[in-house]
Amino acid sequence: MLACIACSTKDGGEGGHRSATATPNSGKSLTSQLKDMVLKFSGSGRHQYKSGGSPSLRTSRFHRSSRLAAYPGIIDESGFTSDGAGEAYTYMRTTTASAGARAAPSTWDLPPKVNHRSFQPRVIRSPSASGVPSIGEEDYDDDDDDDDEETVLLEEDRVPREWTAQVEPGVQITFVSIPGGAGNDLKRIRFSREMFNKWEAQRWWGENYDRVVELYNVQTFSRQQGFSTPTSSVDEAMQRDSFYSRVGSTRESPAMMMPPPPPLPSSGAGREHPISRTASSKAQLSSSSSVAAARPPFYPSTAVPDPSDHVWAHHFNLLNSAAAGPAAPYDPSRGTTSSRDEASVSISNASDLEATEWVEQDEPGVSITIREFGDGTRELRRVRFSRERFGEERAKVWWEQNRDRIHAQYL
């Protein structure tokens, strides 16, 4: 029994020794096999990377190039191509649209799209770019960019744009484009002092009004009419002389259109006529005759009126009408054509021949023009302020403070 155990132990020990001696050789062979396998797998991976590249790498590279496609002056990777034979990528700076279109499907291996439109490369230029075009990669990216561009253009169309045109030497007209492309809004006219004086400027505007309206598609006049002071200190006086608006258009002055025929007495009561100055007070006929004899006679003016009167005529019309109270009954025998500037006399009846007009200097820099009719009715024709002493705002304040006194003293 003991002998058998000893034999088995001896045999086991010998076997263990043999296995121990054989283990280093087998370990070496296993290590070398594993190393060979690792080398084989690593070599095949490098070859596969050179030939095709992994999908995840292609995806990340594609997104990075998509983000940088809008900045061609910095980095432009959208034009490089691969020969597919394991060589390095070629960096192309001079890429044409046709070459990019042929290289894009083979480079990116994009899946076919369901839409019916073919791939159309689009050249994208950045204002800060160096002039090298970059080609858009995907169709839906181009669609998104086009939608963004169309939205920006629509936003620009909704904003009124101010622009200036030089009609002829010495004449500049400022327009404001009406949103929607409906036309232009006439805002300001500037005349050169070296080529035009006040009278020539107004005469030019009266002669060329229709041509300017037709040529520049003028639909409306600027709503900024009235008494806004120009911002330029150099052209301040010229701005005030040549600032024409709907209130003071020369086209509506008596010098530019014929007066209408006198109304009939039967239809005079129901006749609607433009804004006219109303009589604020009446004097006795005898006293008015003596006053009229002391005044110098008025002579009709045939020259073009002062353009500066355009700004104030309508304003004084409204103030005079408000201060005069209820209007006097309309007398058909004294019907005249009324315009907003009324720089010349319009006569519709022989009774108006007896009217006289004179100028009173209320204070230095303030001249008041008064008209008196044969029946003693007076009206305030014009109040003129010197540009050396009064600005527009100061003139308005002065008139508000002295309006009642002027009416009581002169009318």
UniProtKB/Swiss-Prot annotation:
Q: Which InterPro entries match?
A: Brevis_radix_dom (IPR013591), BRX-like (IPR044532)
Q: Which gene encodes it?
A: BRXL2
Q: Which organism is it from?
A: Oryza sativa subsp. japonica
Q: Where in the cell is it found?
A: Nucleus
Q: Which GO terms describe its cellular component?
A: nucleus
The reply on keyword Repeat is yes
Main location class: nucleus
Question: Where does the record place the BRX domain?
Answer: 161-217, 356-411
Output this protein's name. Protein Brevis radix-like 2
- Biased-composition ranges, Low complexity, are 276-294
